[in-house]
Amino acid sequence: MKIGIIAYQGSFEEHFLQLKRAFDKLSLNGEIISIKIPKDLKGVDGVIIPGGESTTIGLVAKRLGLLDELKEKITSGLPVLGTCAGAIMLAKEVSDAKVGKTSQPLIGTMNISVIRNYYGRQKESFEAIVDLSKIGKDKAHVVFIRAPAIAKVWGKAQSLAELNGVTVFAEENNMLATTFHPELSDTTSIHEYFLHLVKG
């Protein structure tokens, strides 16, 4: 199994480590690679889009030709996990809590509406307990950093976890989106769930 992590910025190194732990926990053999240009996608079984600055990631991916390639592969069924900025990238609808509608480059394959900076810029980061029982896991201690919120899900998209009534983890077919940073959590639950999705 080969998993690629978009490695322009953000906590991609932490995703590497968390993914390795998840592979070990599930007794799976896996290869983890960095993805920066379209040819890096060759032969990957799943992709992680980490946190960072969603507009920057989108612009760089577009300039290097990766954005369209990702969209095509994800639409064709390539499993993907988008965390924080990655969740924004996957959303079909994006707005900003302060400035409203945005025109940033997106992959835009998932039936979710995301609000950037939902918790306000002054609340840069916070930690919370999230119930992961819908994926057969225990509650998890997770980290939110300038987090967005999934304001709406529709079609085949469904909410897998909420915090104070707001969706923080959603799934649609081959796509997973979290508004928190599972790579900074003390549990590998989200990465394990992603690997099960990749494994089929």
UniProtKB/Swiss-Prot annotation:
InterPro entries on file: Class_I_gatase-like, PdxT/SNO, PdxT/SNO_CS
Name the record gives this protein: Pyridoxal 5'-phosphate synthase subunit PdxT
Annotated function: Catalyzes the hydrolysis of glutamine to glutamate and ammonia as part of the biosynthesis of pyridoxal 5'-phosphate. The resulting ammonia molecule is channeled to the active site of PdxS.
CDD domains from the UniProt entry: GATase1_PB
SUBUNIT field: In the presence of PdxS, forms a dodecamer of heterodimers. Only shows activity in the heterodimer.
Top-rank lineage group of the source organism: Archaea
Annotated binding of L-glutamine, by residue: 52-54, 116, 145-146
Organism of this sequence: Saccharolobus solfataricus (strain ATCC 35092 / DSM 1617 / JCM 11322 / P2)
Family: Belongs to the glutaminase PdxT/SNO family.
Statement: the UniProt record of this protein carries the keyword Lyase: yes
GO biological process, alphabetically ordered: glutamine catabolic process; pyridoxal phosphate biosynthetic process; pyridoxine metabolic process
PANTHER family: PYRIDOXAL 5'-PHOSPHATE SYNTHASE SUBUNIT SNO, PYRIDOXAL 5'-PHOSPHATE SYNTHASE SUBUNIT SNO1-RELATED
Reactions catalysed: aldehydo-D-ribose 5-phosphate + D-glyceraldehyde 3-phosphate + L-glutamine = pyridoxal 5'-phosphate + L-glutamate + phosphate + 3 H2O + H(+); L-glutamine + H2O = L-glutamate + NH4(+)
Catalytic residues (positions): 84 (nucleophile), 181 (charge relay system), 183 (charge relay system)
